[in-house]
């Protein structure tokens, strides 16, 4: 994929508007607010703008956080201040934190592969979120931007073909782990997926920034 195609893919993600979707406010926050960690954004050497992936991740973190909070309040009838009380709920198929993978080493290619594979799993798990929380107006944007981010990450690989799509058996296993159980268990699995996706995105942002500092060509 060439730079023009990548730019158009990113642009399409930023302008996608779902009816009733508060994307405009997310765009406003993207342009005006700082990153949650307080770190300054990296810049593109030619334009002085943040790298494409960083803008995309920032948007996604904002929207996934909003979606997680909305689902928690609406589905569990609890204030968002009590969200930490659900931290013990886990989903077996969610990817491990990047700090526990090859991203903790200095192998850039292996780390990019881990990120791409993890995002593919979350892309699939978002189907479960859609099935259990169909009224969400944010979810279509989150799903679309996750797909675009996978493309941006693969663009940085030397051999993107190494990361294959999930097989039919893998897809069946992942969805089977979250689609069964009681209504309560399915709701808590949605919450856990959104929580862990947010954490994975933050880990991804940190890993990509480390790579960017090691090589100016990583934009």
Swiss-Prot record:
Signal sequence annotation: 1-20
SMART domains in alphabetical order: IL6
Keywords, comma-separated and alphabetical: Acute phase, Cytokine, Disulfide bond, Growth factor, Secreted, Signal
Subcellular location: Secreted
The keyword S-adenosyl-L-methionine is assigned to this record: no
Disulfides per UniProt: 103-111
Molecular functions (GO terms): cytokine activity; growth factor activity; interleukin-6 receptor binding
Family annotation (InterPro entries): 4_helix_cytokine-like_core, IL-6-like, IL-6/GCSF/MGF
Induction details: by LPS.
GO terms for cellular component: extracellular space
SUPFAM superfamilies: 4-helical cytokines
Any one biological process term the GO annotation gives: cell differentiation
Tissues expressing the protein: Expressed in spleen, gill and gastrointestinal tract, ovary and brain. Highest expression in ovary.
Similarity comment text for this entry: Belongs to the IL-6 superfamily.
Description of how the protein assembles with itself and partners: Component of a hexamer of two molecules each of IL6, IL6R and IL6ST; first binds to IL6R to associate with the signaling subunit IL6ST.
Task performed by this protein: Cytokine with a wide variety of biological functions in immunity, tissue regeneration, and metabolism. Binds to IL6R, then the complex associates to the signaling subunit IL6ST/gp130 to trigger the intracellular IL6-signaling pathway. The interaction with the membrane-bound IL6R and IL6ST stimulates 'classic signaling', whereas the binding of IL6 and soluble IL6R to IL6ST stimulates 'trans-signaling'. Alternatively, 'cluster signaling' occurs when membrane-bound IL6:IL6R complexes on transmitter cells activate IL6ST receptors on neighboring receiver cells.
PANTHER family, per the entry: INTERLEUKIN-6 (PTHR48494:SF1)
Name of the protein: Interleukin-6
Species assigned in the record: Oncorhynchus mykiss (Rainbow trout)
Gene transcribed to yield this protein: il6
């Amino acid at each position: 994929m060439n730079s023009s195609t990548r730019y158009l893919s990113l642009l399409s993600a930023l302008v996608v508007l779902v009816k009733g979707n508060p994307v405009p406010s997310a765009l406003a926050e993207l342009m005006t607010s700082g990153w949650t960690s307080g770190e300054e954004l990296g810049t593109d050497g030619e334009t002085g703008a943040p790298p494409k992936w960083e803008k995309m991740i920032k948007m996604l973190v904002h929207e996934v956080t909003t979606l997680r909070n909305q689902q928690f309040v609406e589905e569990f009838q609890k204030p968002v201040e009590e969200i930490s009380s659900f931290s013990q709920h886990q989903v077996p198929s969610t990817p491990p934190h990047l700090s526990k993978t090859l991203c903790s080493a200095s192998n850039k290619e292996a780390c990019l592969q881990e990120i791409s594979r993890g995002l593919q799993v979350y892309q699939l798990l978002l189907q479960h979120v859609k099935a259990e929380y169909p009224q969400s107006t944010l979810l279509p944007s989150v799903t679309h931007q996750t797909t675009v981010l996978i493309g941006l990450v693969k663009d940085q690989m030397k051999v993107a073909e190494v990361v294959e799509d999930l097989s039919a058996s893998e897809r069946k296993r992942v969805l089977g782990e979250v689609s069964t159980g009681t209504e309560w268990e399915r709701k808590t699995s949605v919450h856990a997926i959104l929580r862990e996706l947010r954490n994975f995105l933050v880990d991804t942002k940190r890993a990509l920034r480390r790579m960017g500092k090691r090589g100016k060509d990583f934009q």
